[in-house]
Curated annotation (Swiss-Prot):
The record marks 94-95 as: Cleavage. This is LexA repressor. The gene is lexA. It comes from Mannheimia succiniciproducens (strain KCTC 0769BP / MBEL55E). Represses a number of genes involved in the response to DNA damage (SOS response), including recA and lexA. In the presence of single-stranded DNA, RecA interacts with LexA causing an autocatalytic cleavage which disrupts the DNA-binding part of LexA, leading to derepression of the SOS regulon and eventually DNA repair. Residues 31-51 bind DNA.
Amino acid sequence: MKPIKALTARQQEVFNFLKHHIETTGMPPTRAEISRELGFRSPNAAEEYLKALARKGVVEILSGTSRGIRLLVDTEESANDEDAGLPLIGRVAAGEPILAEQHIEGTYKVDADMFKPQADFLLKVYGQSMKDIGILDGDLLAVHSTKDVRNGQVIVARIEDEVTVKRLERKGDVVYLHAENEEFKPIVVNLKEQPNFEIEGIAVGIIRNNAWM
C-alpha cells in the first residue's frame, strides 16, 4: 500500500469522525450524518471531503450504498517494528479460546492503534451477508476483543465452532444476529438452549481484500 499523505486539519476532522462513528455504531456514517456533525451546508460538501480522503489513500468510497465508506490502513506505519502486527484467525475449535495458537494462521503488519478501540485480531470475511455496509467477501475484519457489547453493534460471535459477523440485537435470553443483506435471515440464538454461544468482540475496521496483494 502507499503511505498515507498528510491531511489538512478539516480532512483530519472528517477522518476522525468516520472512525468514531464506526467505533460507536459499527457502521460508517452517511453523507448527511457527516454534514450534520461537522456543520457542512450540504451532503455534497461531505462528499467532496470523502473524495479528498480517497485521493490521499485513507478511505475507499463504495458505490451503490449511502454508507459505502471504508477506512484503509497504512501498513508502512508499522513496517519498522518487527513485533507489530495482528494475528489472523482461521478455523476455530469449539470450547477453545479464539486466540489460541492453533487458530492463528499468520500475522499481518498492521498498527493496532489505527483502530479505535484498538484491534486485537483480524478475521477473514467469507460470504456477502454484510455487504450492504461494505464488509465484503475476502476482506479482513479488524476486531476488538470484548464481551461488553451493545445492541446495534457489529459483532463477532461464535456458535460451537462457527464464527459469524453480524449486527447484534438482544431481547432477554434471545439473541438475534442480523445480516446487512436482505437475502439473509437473522440467526436466532436462545441462550438457555445454546450454551456454546460466545461474543468474541466488536468490528472496528476493515482491510480491503486486495490490500495485501
